[in-house]
């Protein structure tokens, strides 16, 4: 996962920094590429659920989706923060707000569907992918806000300190989930 995230980020950064392709263009192109991947995946497999990735073909679709997600996330995060001149903190708030809105909507719709005894899986799959797509620009906005110089709208912690903060947070989360098992899904709820 880390390698594919780095590749997706580097693709966007190289297109914008070395080839002069605008953030608007890269955002649009990667949004289209991601949409085509989702459509192609669904047409071939009739599902986009990550719980049904049980074949090599589905795994290939998944990793292609992840690659485009990271490329799109980098482009859109930079577009909002830099090109639209909103700054890293505002971009962070926008992406966090969108994630919260989708999560809240998911749980409201889930409740309505449960009352009406309707199938909930499409709502869950859609919510998952929308939130997943938005986590990349959120993470990039947080990283940029922490690492960039204060004159550029950041906190000026630098790349090394920011990386150590992220690494520490990941380690704490992994240790916590390993010890508490709170991330395990009850097989009767699937």
Residue ranges and their predicted role:
Residues 1-190:
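Polytopic alpha-helical membrane proteins, predominantly small-molecule transporters/carriers
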